[in-house]
Amino acid sequence: MLAIQALGFIAEDPQRLADFFAATGITAEQIRAVAAEPAFLAGVLEHMLGDESLLLAFAANAGIDPAEVARARGVLGT
């Protein structure tokens, strides 16, 4: 699932992870509890869509078109 891949991309870099925590207010402990919830996963993609440099870095790393992130966000709804 693209959202899980995006979360992993964020988590593998301390600065990206710190930015995610600061922007969302979530903690590492809370992520463990909600990681499979569609609303949380939609939020991960929403965070990525709100930061163009993050979005482009993730898309390049994943070998996908950045528009795929928006499409995945739409599929998750909420």
Please give the residue ranges for each predicted region.
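Metal- and O2-centered redox machinery and metal/ROS homeostasis
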Residues: 1-78
